[in-house]
């Protein structure tokens, strides 16, 4: 990771959760930081930030991967090999200095799965690129915020 990316991510974390903080923000599930897969490079930066934060807050990190299955296919017939996807995600998780649990969810509607996967308000870290136009990733984050989750956006 470049120093610029690390500084940007660290600065963003400091704004949201001060360095002296030793506990989770009020109203969110304690003990777990959830990272939503938003692309390989973006998620790597988010995982690195979540790992640093997890070290401070004595918590674990979970990586949630939402894999869409198109309508013509049966829900359990993923167009991507699950073994391949799991291998890539485990590789990505192993690249950070923290134990990361990987969860892969096959779905038709990502927002619907987020409703079920994040039942209790959670601390969620999402990686992305800075953009003036809200994209799919931003809309997913906004949907989580509407449900009461605390979302931290980490720019790549």
Segments and roles (model prediction):
Residues 53-55, 68, 105-106, 133, ...:
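A composition-biased, non-transmembrane "mature-region" signal
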Residues 2-16, 22-23, 52, 63-87:
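Acidic, proline/glycine-rich short linear motifs
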Residues 34, 60-64, 101, 123, ...:
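A structural signal for isolated positions on well-ordered beta-strands in alpha/beta enzyme cores
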Residues 78-92, 135-145:
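Short, aromatic/basic amphipathic alpha-helical patches
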Residues 23-76, 146-147:
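Small/aliphatic-rich secondary-structure junction motif
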Residues 1-27, 95-124, 130-131, 140-151:
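Structural beta-alpha unit
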Residues 36-40, 105, 126-131, 156:
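Structural motif
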Residues 54-57, 88-98:
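Short helix-loop-beta junction
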């Amino acid at each position: 990771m470049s120093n610029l990316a690390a500084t940007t991510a660290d600065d963003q974390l400091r704004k949201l959760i001060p360095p002296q903080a030793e506990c989770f923000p009020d109203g969110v599930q304690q003990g777990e930081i959830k990272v939503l897969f938003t692309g390989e490079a973006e998620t790597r930066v988010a995982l690195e930030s979540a790992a640093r934060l997890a070290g401070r807050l004595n918590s674990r990190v979970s990586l949630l991967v939402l894999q869409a299955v198109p309508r013509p296919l049966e829900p359990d017939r993923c167009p991507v090999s699950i073994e391949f996807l799991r291998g890539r995600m485990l590789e990505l998780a192993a690249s950070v200095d923290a134990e990361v649990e990987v969860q892969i969810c096959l779905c038709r509607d990502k927002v619907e799965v987020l409703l079920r996967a994040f039942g209790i308000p959670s601390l969620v870290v999402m990686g992305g690129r800075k953009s003036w136009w809200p994209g799919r990733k931003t809309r997913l984050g906004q949907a989580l915020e509407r449900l009461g989750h605390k979302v931290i956006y980490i720019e790549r």
